[in-house]
UniProtKB/Swiss-Prot annotation:
Domain of life: Eukaryota
Coiled-coil stretches noted in the UniProt entry, renumbered to this chain: none
Modified residues (Phosphoserine): 31
Protein name, entry field: Large ribosomal subunit protein eL29
A single GO BP: cytoplasmic translation
GO function terms (MF aspect): structural constituent of ribosome
Length: 152
């Protein structure tokens, strides 16, 4: 008995990709950002059937939006703009307070000290290492090679 052709998978992917990858619905119509969803739904049908209806709907909607904006403008009183004080210095002060704190600043102080050690000039670093007397050499392990002096 022949297999039924109802459940075909032939050329399905081509059919799926024929329309391309679509944008999300919210991003599809860039010119209609502030439009109500009912209008967008109607627009789908209008696009299929008649472009004239679509233009009319768009014009009416634009009129309604502008009228609404004007009404809102009339109702809402403009507020007085208060001058803002710059807040640049407070961060520096709070950082210093954090470092000076006996418990919280412990790690911060250690990190700063480490940075200072690493950034110290080479001549100063050498002077600090030479000041320490060299430790006595530990007895060599059995079978270990004796250290050789590098020629100077």
């Amino acid at each position: 008995m022949a297999k039924s052709k109802n459940h075909t998978t032939h050329n399905q992917s081509r059919k799926w990709h024929r329309n391309g990858i679509k944008k999300p619905r919210s991003q599809r119509y860039e010119s209609l950002k502030g439009v109500d969803p009912k209008f967008l739904r109607n627009m789908r049908f209008a696009k299929k059937h008649n472009k004239k209806g679509l233009k009319k709907m768009q014009a009416n909607n634009a009129k309604a939006m502008s009228a609404r904006a004007e009404a809102v403008k009339a109702l809402v009183k403009p507020k007085e703009i208060k001058p803002k004080m710059p807040t640049g210095g407070s961060r520096k002060l709070s950082r210093l307070a954090y470092i000076a704190h006996p418990k919280l600043g412990k790690r911060a102080r250690a990190r700063i000290a480490k940075g200072l050690r690493l950034c110290r000039p080479k001549s100063q670093a050498k002077a600090s290492t030479k000041a320490k007397p060299p430790a006595a050499a530990a007895p060599a392990a059995k079978g270990a090679q004796a250290p050789t002096k590098a020629p100077e």
